[in-house]
A protein has these predicted regions:
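Helix-loop "lid/cap" segments that line or gate small-molecule binding pockets
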Residues: 53-54, 75
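Active-site neighborhoods of divalent-metal-dependent phosphate/nucleic-acid chemistry enzymes
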Residues: 76-119
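Structured helix-beta-strand junction loops
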Residues: 35-37, 73, 112, 129
Length: 142
């Protein structure tokens, strides 16, 4: 039986590390990935975003420590950026109000027929294109 594919967005990774609402969902997915019920992935662009966000907010040492922790989790980093992924990312970026990094991540989700775990409102515009597992969105302070 083929495993279900699940991709973590940067926001889901940060939710896990920061202990934000929705962390339990990410933890459960990690547990399921160790029993081979699902395949859990992180796109390279999400790993890069995770690193530089930690670097900017907490410094290089913490960024390095957290990145090492990320790489030790039961997830596989998606490094493929072949032509189909480039074209799909370009199509999504041209068609929807999303960032370049989100277009790359969404292209993986689309082409791998995966589900995306996130808490980024930008992805909600893609709900007809990709499968979404939306974590509780952060409330905006007025």
């Amino acid at each position: 039986m083929k495993s279900k594919k699940v991709i973590l967005d940067t926001s889901a990774i940060l939710t896990y590390f920061e202990g934000e609402e929705g962390k339990e969902t990410v933890e459960k997915l990690m547990i399921r990935s160790t029993s081979e019920k699902i395949e859990l992935f992180i796109p390279f662009s999400a790993a890069i975003e995770f690193y530089y966000i930690n670097f900017n907010l907490q410094g290089e040492e913490t960024a390095n420590q957290r990145f090492a922790m990320l790489m030790s989790l039961p997830v596989e980093v998606l490094k493929n950026i072949d032509e189909p992924y480039m074209i799909q990312a370009g199509r999504l970026k041209a068609s929807y109000p999303i960032s370049f990094a989100d277009a790359l991540i969404a292209a993986y989700v689309y082409l791998e027929n995966a589900s995306l775990v996130h808490k980024d409102p930008e992805y909600l515009t893609l709900e007809k294109e990709i499968n979404l597992i939306t974590l509780p969105l952060k409330k905006k302070l007025v």
